[in-house]
Swiss-Prot record:
A GO-annotated cellular component: centriole
Segments of skewed composition (Polar residues): 921-936
Phosphoserine carried by residues: 781, 788, 994
Protein known as: M-phase phosphoprotein 9
Biased composition (Low complexity): 483-495, 949-967
Coiled coil: 609-804, 1109-1174
């Protein structure tokens, strides 16, 4: 859309418009109807003037409110989000509206500026029409002008092949342009109007020629010859007014030179101009129309910036010259011309008659010269030159043209013509191609080193060199050299265009040409024309572009031979003269004479070559001018009519363009409003669509997440259902198991109660039995006491009888003393041996039956109580061992057996309820006693083991509480405690014996009888222990710690004996126990008869009773261990083989059973050895 581009290029356009409205140098009318930039309004009123700009976005709040309501009605939106969006949208809309308003304001300003320009251009067109009529009348009256009407009007169509230059001055800074417009307006009489209407570009070139008030002004100058042609003066007032309303295409000298290269040669009479005496008027040609718009001037300026570099110093002096010209435009015009080489001044028509002079670029005055004026000899002396220079110092009107355009070299023109004839490419003879490198020009002009004021003052301190330089500088080779010479050269047609200040090498010093005709050069007819000191640098002198008028092609050819010759030709005069000649050397007459001689020779050669050429050229030009004079007025009229028609066309085109612009503006306004509305709607719709898309994406993601969550929850629900079913089944199983366990527990409680009742009943029975047993013990002790007394009395009586019989026999029968003693000894032995067939009391032999029984019992006892060590015992000790065994066996009375059985039943009942762990931890280390003391007193070992078993059974918390023993011993314990009776000397059986019985007793009989000494231990017992007589020292009770410390060593001994001497199985042992009980019953029949009558301490009965009770416990323990061993072996046999697959629990159970079996085997070995030691089990010796 067009307005978008307008917004982007706003700053550029505004800047260009600002430069356009301030620049009055162009009459170009830019009616640009391009749709992209509608800037013009012809009515002078902007389409927006008087109106307030509506809001850029109409209905912004309404649209936003409706959008917000729609989004909020859709729901599922956050209020904070909408507030933030609303705030940001409002800010965005305000920003866009502000920018659009600023753009519109800038457009309005631009429109106003364009309108002003158009109005001014229209006024200028009207003035052009009025001035064209006066020009036509002026041209009709002037008979000296031979100018073609077409070229005088300067109007050329676009199709014209004439490449005439429009000398443009690029835009400088606006203040500088305004100063130049006010003080140094160009003397260009050709007004170029470039109108760009959008449909085509038209250029109107008009030459402003005014007829002077007095026709005599043309020849009023004192030095102007009759043949000199002067240009009509231009009224300063009209030109100044025109400048105010018209824009001139003004070019810098650089651009002038460039454009002249491209232009076609113009007929000489086509460019006559008016030059006033004191004011320089630069001829500006109307050339090829510029088809570019107004904005192309900036581009032109950029292209020509490097070419203006060498005239900056002149530009700095231009302001000073302009100010001086403002104050004194008449009196100080020379100063302004000297200080500002680029200044252009408009001359008033009434000032001096020399205003009419040929342009420095047309070369028109050359062809008006007579043939005699083509060459002048050099002055004979320097003094004459100085005098001629001083005499030519006339009014400043003659010197104001010193800075005007200078003429090209005739040599250059000749060479150019030759090149064209040979169809060679044009040779660039100027130094403009290298403007930064100044031409090396040899000159003798001392005024080059003078300041402008010294040059202007007319006082020439170095008159002679100046005069000499006036002669030198106009030779064909040196005509382009920067000299201050007078134009009255021998080649007066060169117009003495002094270029001293315009050369790039010498920009500070404008040429100051004095109208001083040299005496020797009489024909100085065109000295006024030569004072057209161009404000352009010397390289930009407007040449007589191909002066030859032989053909039309020659007219149209371009001749840009600038005043500054190319660098290769500039030092042409220095062939015989040094390039650098100091000012002091110029005073030397020898050097000066040499210089003059060289220059004369050079001039002679040059003039001789050019004379024929110029004569032919002059003739052809004269013929051409005569042909053009006839049709000049008619051409002017035709051209004027064409111009009027063209102005009408332009006016109609202007109105059409204005209406077109207005319609386009209206259309653009409507489109802009529509675009803004559409932009709002589009932005709103796009934002809404984006928001909806975001919401759709969010809903999609949320739906995906919800689906995933649903799937995950379903899977979890299934897992929970399965877990719930499993838990339900487990709960049912647990309830059933709990019911079953509750039932079992109820049964167990009932059984426990029944067992508790039975236990109480058994306990009561046991208490009654214990009481009865105590009573029996008391009776037995009384009876034993009585028996012991009776035996003591009997023995005493026997002893007394023996003593009396011995005394009697010694007195009466002495010879048979030996036989009597032998018989008494034998009878005594038989009488004392228990089990003998003699009675203890009477000494008579007993019955046969009783004796057989006693013998059988004796043999059985001797066989049953013999240990493997008895085989090694000496035969001498057999009698005493037999006696001890008989006494041990006969001491077990029926009452003692009954008491033993009761104690065994009670002990085994408590022991049987112990756990296996307590059995292994308590029984195992307490089965045997220490090595020495256990072998001596097995009764004590049994009593201690019984106590430990009772204490261990009481520690079991899972069993019903047993009878705990109090710290004070009960009556039964007191009765069961072995009592050692300390007999008095009179009551002691041994000590009570009379001295006569002492020799009957053996050594063993004198010691107390011990039933706890085994026969197999007699060899190992020390002698001191056998010889002890105190029975209290023999009953030693070791503490529990000592017995436990020595258990392991004794156990090892017992196991060794068990494995070596008892390989028979356990059931045999059980049978032996039953056999033994039967044997003991049979044995009890003759117990009284087998009881020894010898002295037996009372304590031995109690020790024996404890020993028998401990053996019964051991036998019962042996039976239970054997039964448990059988059960474990049966369980192990039912387990799978180790090669098969078994579970971990099965393996653990198997290992536990094997460990238990090993422990039972060890216990069985220990118990078996203990029983064998006391001859309860059969040994290998008894088989």
């Amino acid at each position: 859309m067009e307005e978008f581009d307008l917004v982007k290029t706003l700053h550029k356009t505004s800047s260009s418009v600002g430069s356009d409205e301030n620049s009055l140098h162009s009459l170009g009318l830019n009616l640009n109807t391009d749709r992209s930039s509608p800037h013009l309004s012809t009515n002078g009123v902007s389409s927006f003037s008087g109106k307030t700009r509506p809001s850029v976005i109409q209905g912004t709040v309404e649209v936003l409110t409706s959008l917000m309501q729609e989004l909020q009605n859709s729901g599922k939106t956050d209020s904070e989000l909408w507030k933030n969006c609303e705030t940001r949208w409002l800010q965005l809309f305000n920003l866009v509206e502000k920018q659009c308003q600023e753009q519109i304001v800038a457009q309005q300003e631009q429109f106003h500026n364009q309108i002003q320009h158009i109005q001014e251009e229209i006024k200028n067109l009207v003035k052009l029409q009025t001035s064209s009529a006066s020009l036509a009348s002026c041209e009709g009256n002037s008979s000296n002008k031979q100018v073609s009407s077409e070229s005088q009007m300067g109007f050329f169509s676009l199709s014209s092949e004439r490449n005439e230059s429009v000398i443009h001055y690029p835009e400088s800074t606006e203040p500088e342009i305004q100063q130049e417009m006010s003080t140094s307006q160009p003397d260009c009489n050709v007004d170029s109007c470039s109108v760009s209407s959008g449909y085509g570009t038209f250029c109107i070139s008009e030459l402003n020629l005014y007829k002077s008030k007095d026709p005599k002004e043309f020849m009023e100058h004192i030095d102007v010859p009759k043949g000199q042609y002067v240009a009509p003066a231009v009224p300063a007032e009209s030109l100044v007014d025109g400048v105010k309303n018209e824009n001139f295409y003004i070019q810098t000298p650089e651009e002038c030179h460039v454009s002249l290269k491209e232009d076609v040669s113009i007929s000489p009479g086509e460019f006559e101009h008016n030059f006033l005496g004191e004011n320089k008027v630069s001829e500006v040609y109307s050339g090829k129309t510029n088809s570019n718009a107004i904005t192309s001037w900036a581009q032109k300026l950029k292209q020509n910036q490097p070419k203006r570099a060498h005239v900056e110093d002149g530009g700095s002096r231009s302001k000073q010259g302009n100010e001086q010209s403002k104050k004194t435009p008449i009196e100080k015009s020379d100063f302004a011309a000297a200080t500002h080489p680029r200044a252009f001044y408009l001359s008033k028509p009434d000032e001096t008659p020399n205003a009419w002079m040929s342009d420095s670029g047309t070369g028109l005055t050359y062809w008006k010269l007579e043939e005699k004026d083509m060459h002048h000899s050099l002055p004979e002396t320097l003094e004459k030159t100085f005098i001629s220079l001083s005499s030519t110092d006339v009014s400043p009107n003659q010197s104001n043209t010193s800075n005007e355009m200078k003429l090209p070299s005739l040599k250059d023109i000749y060479y150019k013509k030759q090149r064209e004839n040979k169809q060679l490419p044009e040779r660039n003879l100027t130094s403009a191609s290298n403007p930064n490198h100044p031409p090396e020009v040899l000159t003798l002009d001392p005024t080059l080193h003078m300041k402008p004021k010294q040059q202007i003052s007319g006082i020439q301190p170095h008159g002679l060199p100046n005069a000499l330089d006036d002669r030198i500088s106009f030779s064909p080779d040196s005509v382009l050299e920067p000299s201050m010479s007078s134009p009255s050269d021998i080649d007066s047609f060169s117009q003495a265009s002094n270029v001293t200040s315009q050369l790039p090498g010498f920009p500070k010093y404008p040429s100051h040409t004095k109208a001083s005709p040299v005496d020797s050069w009489k024909n100085q007819t065109f000295q006024n024309e030569s004072r057209t000191s161009s404000t352009f640098p010397s390289v930009y002198t407007i040449t007589s572009n191909d002066i030859s008028v032989n053909t039309v092609d020659e007219e149209n050819t371009v001749m840009v031979a600038s005043a500054s010759v190319s660098q290769s030709q500039l030092p042409g005069t220095a062939n015989s003269v040094p390039e650098c000649i100091s000012l002091t050397s110029l005073e030397d007459p020898v050097i000066l004479s040499k210089i003059r001689q060289n220059l004369k020779e050079k001039h002679a050669r040059h003039i001789a070559d050019l004379r024929a050429y110029y004569e032919s050229e002059i003739n052809s030009l004269k013929q051409k001018l005569e042909a053009k004079e006839i049709s000049g007025v008619e051409d002017w009229k035709i051209t004027n009519q064409i111009l009027v028609d063209r102005c009408g066309q332009l006016d109609s085109a202007l109105h059409e363009a204005t209406s077109r612009v207005r319609t386009l503006e209206n259309k653009n306004n409507l489109l802009e409003i529509e675009v803004n509305d559409l932009r709002e709607r589009f932005s709103a719709a796009s934002s809404a669509s984006k928001i909806l898309q975001e919401r759709i994406e969010e809903m999609r993601t949320s739906s995906k997440e919800k689906d995933n969550t649903i799937i995950r929850l379903k899977s979890r629900l299934q897992d929970l259902e399965e877990a719930f079913e499993n838990a339900y089944k487990l709960s049912d199983d647990k309830e059933a198991q709990l019911k079953q366990e509750n039932k079992m527990f109820q049964d167990l409680l009932g059984e426990y109660e029944s067992l508790g009742k039975e236990h109480r009943r058994v306990k009561d029975a046991l208490n009654t039995t214990e009481n009865k047993l105590l009573d029996a013990y008391t009776q037995i002790s009384d009876l034993k006491r009585m028996i012991s007394k009776l035996e003591a009395q009997v023995k005493q009586v026997e002893h007394e009888n023996m003593l009396s019989l011995r005394h009697n026999s010694r007195i009466h029968v002495r010879p048979s003393r030996a036989n009597t003693l032998a018989t008494s000894d034998v009878s005594r032995r038989k009488w004392l041996i228990p089990g003998a067939e003699y009675s203890i009391f009477t000494g008579q032999p007993l019955d046969t039956q009783d004796s057989n029984v006693d013998n059988q019992l004796e043999e059985t006892c001797s066989l049953g109580h013999r240990s493997p060590l008895e085989k090694d015992s000496s035969p001498g000790s057999s009698s005493t061992s037999l006696l001890i065994k008989k006494q041990r066996e006969t001491s077990d009375t029926p009452i003692m057996r009954a008491l033993k059985e009761l104690d065994e039943g009670k002990i085994f009942k408590n022991w049987g309820t112990q756990t296996e762990k307590e059995d292994t931890s308590n029984i195992n280390p307490r089965q045997t006693e220490t090595s020495v003391n256990a072998s001596r007193s097995p009764e004590k070992c049994a009593q201690q083991r019984q106590k430990r078993l009772n204490s261990a059974s009481q520690r079991s918390s899972s069993l019903p509480p047993s009878n705990r023993k109090s710290s004070t011993p009960t009556k039964r314990e007191i009765m069961l405690t072995p009592v050692t009776v300390a007999y008095s000397p009179k009551r002691s059986p041994k000590e009570n014996l009379s001295p006569g019985f002492s020799h009957l007793l053996s050594k063993n009989e004198s010691s107390p009888i011990r039933f706890d000494i085994l026969l197999d231990d007699l060899d190992t017992v020390p002698v001191s222990t056998l010889q002890r007589t105190n029975p209290r020292k023999q009953l030693q009770f070791l503490p529990l710690d000592d017995s436990e410390e020595k258990t392991y060593s004794e156990k090892a001994t017992d196991n060794h004996v068990n494995h070596s001497s008892c390989p028979e199985p356990v059931p045999n042992g059980v049978k032996k126990v039953s056999v033994r009980t039967a044997w003991e019953k049979n044995k009890s029949v003759s117990y009284e008869q087998c009881k020894p009558v010898s002295v037996t301490p009372q304590g031995n009965d109690f020790e024996y009773t404890a020993k028998i009770r401990t053996l019964a416990e051991t036998e019962r323990f042996f039976d239970e261990l054997t039964k448990e061993k059988d059960q474990i072996e049966a369980a192990l046999s039912r387990m799978p083989s180790p090669g098969g697959r078994i579970t971990l629990q099965t393996r653990l159970n198997q290992e536990a059973l094997e460990d238990r079996l090993e422990r039972i085997n060890r216990e069985l070995g220990s118990v078996r050895m203990t029983l064998k030691k006391f001859h309860v089990l059969r040994t290998s010796a008894n088989l």
